[in-house]
A protein has these predicted regions:
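H-loop/switch region of ABC-family ATPase nucleotide-binding domains
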Residues: 13-14, 290-291
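Helix-to-loop junction immediately C-terminal to a conserved catalytic motif
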Residues: 155
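Conserved ABC transporter NBD signature motif
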Residues: 162-176
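Conserved ABC ATPase "signature" region
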Residues: 209-226
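Conserved ABC ATPase signature
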Residues: 230-234, 238
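ABC ATPase C-loop
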Residues: 247-248
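Catalytic Walker B motif of ABC-type/P-loop ATPase nucleotide-binding domains
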Residues: 255-258
């Protein structure tokens, strides 16, 4: 335990609730300048108004959203699929959630008997999963459970066995690459433009460009002041906001966001949540992968928890 050993620790962080009983002193930075310094006790005693005025994230743990579905759950809900392998799936949703999902089953993505493996190690074994249009579905679970792998399958970057339908029609992986857009956890793999503004317009024909819309999106994501800078020169949080803004510029049917709140403060977390909600309200299929309970509370409609599979092939 570094704290108990007397070591000097410096933690640069937006997520604060887990730092109770760890930090002794708090320094607030703005524009590269120290704007406030205080004992940690003063931070934890702040009112909600003072906290949000300072742009700080939640000081106490957010009540977790309960999953409506648990995939790969090792319990009596296990059942055999047609191939004889175990499909561990437990539905713990309320009746209202079940009824709502059933009315939307024909609209959106439906995965059936989906299986994916790395060599002899099976990562995904999903008898059925519905990802409806017009709602934000959150995938949660421990590292290594297969969340990011599933998102790559959804947008056609990985091929899996089984059937994936969009609005009742089977769509193969090649077609899904055209219909889907993914914001990866490692945003550096998605930054290609020479300037921030250019990043938002890559791949969009000039006849379809709307400069006013580009300006609005830059403003919404707090990127106007860095519009002429190279994307790789931005801070981690600015890069995260840029790839989310780029997703907002394209017109796709399936949007996947892998840890989209990484490096975001209170204001920018909520602007990102607003963007995600806007896409859902535009009747798109929207999926987020996150460990961030604040983001879930801000934009998720329901939660699917993925447990790691324990069996190999």
């Amino acid at each position: 335990d570094l704290h108990a050993s007397g070591a000097t620790m410096v933690i640069a962080e937006h997520r604060l609730s887990y730092l109770h009983d760890i930090v002794d002193r708090v320094i607030l930075l703005d524009g590269g300048r120290i704007v406030r310094e205080m004992p940690a006790a003063h931070l934890w005693a702040m009112s909600e108004r003072e906290r949000t005025d300072l742009g700080l994230r939640a000081l106490r743990p957010v009540t977790p959203m309960q999953p409506s579905l648990v995939l790969h759950a090792e319990d009596e809900g296990s059942e055999k699929n047609d191939q004889g392998s175990t499909a561990h799936t437990t539905d713990i949703s309320t009746q209202n959630a079940q009824d709502d999902a059933s009315t939307r089953s024909a609209r959106g993505l439906v995965l059936e008997n989906l299986r994916f493996s790395y060599g002899s190690h099976r990562v995904l074994n999903i008898p059925r999963l519905e990802l409806p249009r017009g709602r934000v579905t959150a995938l949660v679970g421990p590292n290594g459970a297969g969340k990011s792998t599933l998102t790559r399958v959804l947008v056609g970057l990985e091929r899996a066995r089984g059937t994936i339908r969009l609005d009742g029609r089977i769509i193969r992986s090649k077609e899904r690459t055209k219909l889907g857009y993914v914001v990866m956890q490692d945003v550096h793999r998605q930054l290609f433009g020479a300037e921030v503004r250019e990043e938002l317009t890559l791949g969009i024909p000039s006849k379809d460009l709307d400069d006013d819309r580009v300006d609005r999106i830059l403003i919404d994501h707090g990127l106007t002041d860095v519009a002429e800078r190279h994307p790789m020169s931005l801070s981690g949080g600015q890069k995260q906001r840029l790839v989310v803004a780029a997703a907002q510029m394209v017109d796709k049917e399936i949007y996947v966001f892998d840890e989209p709140s990484s490096g975001l403060d209170y204001r920018h977390l909520h602007s990102t949540a607003h963007t995600i909600r806007d896409l859902a309200e535009a009747d798109k299929v929207v999926v987020i992968v996150t460990h961030d309970e604040e983001l879930l509370a801000a934009c998720a409609d329901h939660v699917v928890k993925i447990q790691p599979l324990t069996r190999s092939l």
